Amino acid sequence: LKSLGTKSLKNPEELEIEDITNSNLSKEMDNSGNASFYYLKHAIEMVQSLPKATLVTGPICKKSWAESGHHYPGQTEFLAESCNAKDVGMLFTAKSPITGWRFNTLLATTHIPLKEVPKHLNKNLIFSKLDQLSNFAKKFKNNPHLKIAGLNPHAGENGLLGLEETAWMKEALKQWSELNPDIKIEGPMSPDSCWISSAKAWQKKISDKNDGILAMYHDQGLIPVKVIASNYSVNTTLGLPFVRTSPDH
């Protein structure tokens, strides 16, 4: 699929298909992975050459990419490199069909092993992600209320179950809040209760204290997103020179 004009988006009679080199899809991971990699590469080049173009991607098999020699953790990381984007964010957003409430979750870290997460977290990263999350949340509310999940169970329980929250996270959040007085933030919160108000807002009552949540790692954020907003959430990459989205999968 090459492109769709907005006027023909509802019921298109004709679609323009981009003709690129065929690939014989099979169970051979190197063949299939190589094809999907170069299809995405070609799509990125097309979007960069067109004014106001956007990109929608489907799922890939990360192992197939690796087997074919393309060693990227995911499409987000390849997109960032291709666009020379130094600071991108993986955000999941959905609108409740019941209440109309907007559900936003941003990941501080993305496709890395769980044991590597603490090594990647620091004050500068949290500042950057809160900037991204607040800017996105402002599209729907002028003075958003953000929640930040802790890294450890019960947000470390005052150092008993982990030191990151008391060692630097609390102070980092305080400093960011002082620089952004129009944004209300809450955290680091116990991760097991951070998304409770999201579930309520999705089903019954819109929350005025939950306009965005910052998760520390992939599964911490994606599990509640998929449980609460399955089949409705969309992944969007913040920080690219164009809009890129992907159905949550």
Which residues does each predicted region cover?
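Anion-binding alpha/beta catalytic cores of soluble intermediary-metabolism enzymes, centered on
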Residues: 1-249
